[in-house]
Curated annotation (Swiss-Prot):
Compositional bias (Low complexity): 66-87
Gene: Arl6ip4
Function: Involved in modulating alternative pre-mRNA splicing with either 5' distal site activation or preferential use of 3' proximal site.
Protein's UniProt name: ADP-ribosylation factor-like protein 6-interacting protein 4
Major place of residence: nucleus
Residues covered by region (Disordered): 1-152
Compartment(s) of residence: Nucleus, Nucleolus; Nucleus speckle
Composition skew (Basic and acidic residues), residue ranges: 21-35
Organism expressing this protein natively: Mus musculus
Length: 229
């Protein structure tokens, strides 16, 4: 009987131990399942969070690209508008300058035409009013006996005022005359109205001319300074 009781006790103990082991195994399994479920839920949450972050990032990128495109389009439109306005301003300035230049040209042409007309009128008036001739002087002298009598010098001046032909001019310019300088005493050859000619002389004649010239220079100096009585 004692042996049977010991067997029963050992069986009950083994059963209780096996029950405990089973319960421990079950608890371990349940804890493992719970940990697995937690890790799975965590991984799912992490995946969901990462997916939402990716979506938000993609949204931000799209917004940035749209903003950059809008800013670039606005800047390009503003630059094109500024360039068009600057080109319009340049064209207006060029047109204004061209108008000013044309006005100045017209004014210059008018002034030139006016001057030419004035000169032509003056020349025509001078031609229409000729100066007094020698015949007119003679007529006036014959008509008015009480008037002044013309001298030879006045007659020569009046004659010089008359137009001469080419033959008369050549004959006048071909006349050679000797003129004595009162200050130096030198005798010069003058052709026509004032062309001075050189006279070819010998050495002795040249010395005499120089002596006369120096003597005349001295006398002229003494007369100017008052040294001569």
């Amino acid at each position: 009987m004692a042996h049977v009781g010991s067997r029963k006790r050992s069986r009950s103990r083994s059963r209780s131990r096996s029950g405990r082991r089973g319960s421990e195994k079950r608890s371990k399994r349940s804890s493992k399942d719970a940990s697995r479920n937690c890790s799975a839920s965590r991984s799912q949450g992490h995946k969901a969070g990462s997916a939402s972050g990716v979506e938000e990032r993609s949204k931000h990128k799209a917004q940035r690209t749209s903003r950059s495109s809008s800013t670039s389009s606005s800047s390009s439109s503003s630059s094109s508008a500024s360039s068009s306005s600057s080109s319009d301003g340049r064209k207006k300035r060029a047109k204004h300058k061209e108008k000013k230049r044309k006005k100045k040209k017209k004014k210059r042409k008018k002034k030139l035409k006016k001057r030419v007309k004035e000169k032509a009128v003056a020349v025509h008036q001078a031609e229409a009013l000729p100066g007094p001739s020698l015949d007119q002087w003679h007529r006036s002298a014959g008509e008015d006996n009480d008037g002044p009598v013309l001298t030879d010098e006045q007659k020569s001046r009046i004659q010089a005022m008359k137009p001469m032909t080419k033959e008369e001019w050549d004959a006048r310019q071909s006349v050679i005359r000797k003129v004595v300088d009162p200050e130096t005493g030198r005798t010069r050859l003058i052709k026509g109205d004032g062309e001075v000619l050189e006279e070819i002389v010998t050495k002795e004649r040249h010395r005499e001319i120089n002596k006369q010239a120096t003597r005349g220079d001295g006398l002229a100096f003494q007369m100017r300074t008052g040294l001569l009585p």
